[in-house]
């Protein structure tokens, strides 16, 4: 686990998490103490004889491994609470003992923990709790609880569960390193306990949300049953039945509100984070295992899965569509003036930009669906790679810690320090996640090298008379090969990318995505023009294409051999032509790649508290910030500020400023089009509303408002 959950200075004044010692005044206890009296009754299947036994009475019959007998005796001699403060003591022996019990008898973690020590480890259960009983009252008209009261009960219950889960995870962290002849066996025993704790934490962290959802579903069933009863009810009973139905509808509204509030609450976030801590060992193991399925020569599958659709896409939109449009306009619109050149650039860019987004949104989902349909995704490992979830592998820090074996609450300063540490670690991981994409300097350079290199090779082969490299198909194929090489390079980087956590574990940054694709959903995600975000993407691609074409058209033409001349061009002319071919490709792609990252950059800027001041111009604001604040943390960086005295970071900042300069004119135009788009749609909606024929109910309501009808 990440060490920041335990961290904090040793000499600070402590806030106690629990209070069970008779000699300590109650006011020194932690306000969210998890005492025995706060725990709900056990469910029937958990209230066996072990629940009523004391630790001393039950421990004699605990089925631990023979090698753990002395450990059990030492555990029995421990104090459950600190002698002075009354805070719970974190046992370094308990996790191994629970694992030993679980190996002998596979029961849920919460049952076995209580079996080890009922006084110390009676865990908080949703089943049978006051909270569950209170939620059940929502289905009883006339007994519906107060929303604020239930909300506080939910909050307190969630805090208690999170405290207990943190206690148990800290208990596992406190287990000493296994040594001696039983080291391997004890390590496996600890892993059993850790896995069981993770499973319990998963259930416990979801119990409140599932309980609320079940209560809402139960109310729906009651309402449906009442609707059936009302159909056959006598007239005299209908009034009371309608009242009961309305009470249930109101109760459902309250529960839906409580559920929505809880899902967004800090308590729910903390529960999810604590559960992630308890499951982290298994999550990392699963990620490593999954990555190993595409390790070595098996990595050819993901590379092909990325290269083939990118080859088809690049050959189509960068090759055939853009170049055929350019060739057609060259014959149609003579280059007589700058206006004619701008007109051609506008047409070529708009067509190519729209084609770029359309083809990418169609080809890749269809190719992935075809792989899954034929089974090649599994047989040949032809699966895409996806980034791991940052918050899952780097959860929020704990609020509690172990201080000399006592469970205590961290001070606000310690919490702030740990949060800053987690934030910095997440930034490192997020940098690795975007490093291979075309929205990162490294990823962009890969793409520029691949596309520029393929066009340079095509031009060279043409100039030395090996191929006719000026045909439409030759240029389109070169674009396709560039796309394939770019996608292959980026996938290869993803296959090798790892994040090393503070404990030295190597965690894969990308993992194979074997989830079943939904072709219709995937196509709509990029092609549903009813969505403002999709339309904005098309606007950005079209306007980026115009700017790209304008930049490319400013380049001088390649040197061609005079008609009827024999031999080949000079070496200098060939090198110049290769450079021009590569530069033309890079100049066109630079604006496209720069602008396609604006959406993510705007979101990151807003999350960092630096954006959102002008929502109508948020894309322009992002471009300006890239020029004015290229060193900000929300931008992807390859180098840290301290690397080589900051010199590489200065060069990278200049790179981001250049990107911002390319983004600014395009995104100003995009924001303008967005405003016009929104205005037109609002005007159309208003016109439709105005033309809509009034209904009889509308006429009656208007007459009632004007006093023409008497209310009944």
Swiss-Prot record:
Q: Where is the composition biased (Polar residues)?
A: 44-57
**Which keywords describe this protein according to UniProt?**
Host membrane, Membrane, Secreted, Virulence
GO CC, alphabetical: extracellular region; host cell membrane; membrane
What is the protein's major site of localization? Answer: secreted
> What residue spans carry the region label Disordered?
22-58
**Up-regulation conditions:** Transcriptionally induced by HrpL.
Q: Where in the cell is it found?
A: Secreted; Host membrane
Oligomeric state and interaction partners are given as: Interacts with the chaperone ShcM. Interacts with host plant BIG5/ATMIN7.
Q: What does this protein do?
A: Involved in the suppression of basal resistance and promotion of disease symptoms in plants. Mediates the ubiquitination and degradation, via the host proteasome, of a low-abundance immunity-associated protein in Arabidopsis thaliana. May be involved in the inhibition of a host vesicle trafficking pathway.
- The protein depicted here goes by the name Effector protein HopM1
Which gene is transcribed and translated to give this protein? hopM1
């Amino acid at each position: 686990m990440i060490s920041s959950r335990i961290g904090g200075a040793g000499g600070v004044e402590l806030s106690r998490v629990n209070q069970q010692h008779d000699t300590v005044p109650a006011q020194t206890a932690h306000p969210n103490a998890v005492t025995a009296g706060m725990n709900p009754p056990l469910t029937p299947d958990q209230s066996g004889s072990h629940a009523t036994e004391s630790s001393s009475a039950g421990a004699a019959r605990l089925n631990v491994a023979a090698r753990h007998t002395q450990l059990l005796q030492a555990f029995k001699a421990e104090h459950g609470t600190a002698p002075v403060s009354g805070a719970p003591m974190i046992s370094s022996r308990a996790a191994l003992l629970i694992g030993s019990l679980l190996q002998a008898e596979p029961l849920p973690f919460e049952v076995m923990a209580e079996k080890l020590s009922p006084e110390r480890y009676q865990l908080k259960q949703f089943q049978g709790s006051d909270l569950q009983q209170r939620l059940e009252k929502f289905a009883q008209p006339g007994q519906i609880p107060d929303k604020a009261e239930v909300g506080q009960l939910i909050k307190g219950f969630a805090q208690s569960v999170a405290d207990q889960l943190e206690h148990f995870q800290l208990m596992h962290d406190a287990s000493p390193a296994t040594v001696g002849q039983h080291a391997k066996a004890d390590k496996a025993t600890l892993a059993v306990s850790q896995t069981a704790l993770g499973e319990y934490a998963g259930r416990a962290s979801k119990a409140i949300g599932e309980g609320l959802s079940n209560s809402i579903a139960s109310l729906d069933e009651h309402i449906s049953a009442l609707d059936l009863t009302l159909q056959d009810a006598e007239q005299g009973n209908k009034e009371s039945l309608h009242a009961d139905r309305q009470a249930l509808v109101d109760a459902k509204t309250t529960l839906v509100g409580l559920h929505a509030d809880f899902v967004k609450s800090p308590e729910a976030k903390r529960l999810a984070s604590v559960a992630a801590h308890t499951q982290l060992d298994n999550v990392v193991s699963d990620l490593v295992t999954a990555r190993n399925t595409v390790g070595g020569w098996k990595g050819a599958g993901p590379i092909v899965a990325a290269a083939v659709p990118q080859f088809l896409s690049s050959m189509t939109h960068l090759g055939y569509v853009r170049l055929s449009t350019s060739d057609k306009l060259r014959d149609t619109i003579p280059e007589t003036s700058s206006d004619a050149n701008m007109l051609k650039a506008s047409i070529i860019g708009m067509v190519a930009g729209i084609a770029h987004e359309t083809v990418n949104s169609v080809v890749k989902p269809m190719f992935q669906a075809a792989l899954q349909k034929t089974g090649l995704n599994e047989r040949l490992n032809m699966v895409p790679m996806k980034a791991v979830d940052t918050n899952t592998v780097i959860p929020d820090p704990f609020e509690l810690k172990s201080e000399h074996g006592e469970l205590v609450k961290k001070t606000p300063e310690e919490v702030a320090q740990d949060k800053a540490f987690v934030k910095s670690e997440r930034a490192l991981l997020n940098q690795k996640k975007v490093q291979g994409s075309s929205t990162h300097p490294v990823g962009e350079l890969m793409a520029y090298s691949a596309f520029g290199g393929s066009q340079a090779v095509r031009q060279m082969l043409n100039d030395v008379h090996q191929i006719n490299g000026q045909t439409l198909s030759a240029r389109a194929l070169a674009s396709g090969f560039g796309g394939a090489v770019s996608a292959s390079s980026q996938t290869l980087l993803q296959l090798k990318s790892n994040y090393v956590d503070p404990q030295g574990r190597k965690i894969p940054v990308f993992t194979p995505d074997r989830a079943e694709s939904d072709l219709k959903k995937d196509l709509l995600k990029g092609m549903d023009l009813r969505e403002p975000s999709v339309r904005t993407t098309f606007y950005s691609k079209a306007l980026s294409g115009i700017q790209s074409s304008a930049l490319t058209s400013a380049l001088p033409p390649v040197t061609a051999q005079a008609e009827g001349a024999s031999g080949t061009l000079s070496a200098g002319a060939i090198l110049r032509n290769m450079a021009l071919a590569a530069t033309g490709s890079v100049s066109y792609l630079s604006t496209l790649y720069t602008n396609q990252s604006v959406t993510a950059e705007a979101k990151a800027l807003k999350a960092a508290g630096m954006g959102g001041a002008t929502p109508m111009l948020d894309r322009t604001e992002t471009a300006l910030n890239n020029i004015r604040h290229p060193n900000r943390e929300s931008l992807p960086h390859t180098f840290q500020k301290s690397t080589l005295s900051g010199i590489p970071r200065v060069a990278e900042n200049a790179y981001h400023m250049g990107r911002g300069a390319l983004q600014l004119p395009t995104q100003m135009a995009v924001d303008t089009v967005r405003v016009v788009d929104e205005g037109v749609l609002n005007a159309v909606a208003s016109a439709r509303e105005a033309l809509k024929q009034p209904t009889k109910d509308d006429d009656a309501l208007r007459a009632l408002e004007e006093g023409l009808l008497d209310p009944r």
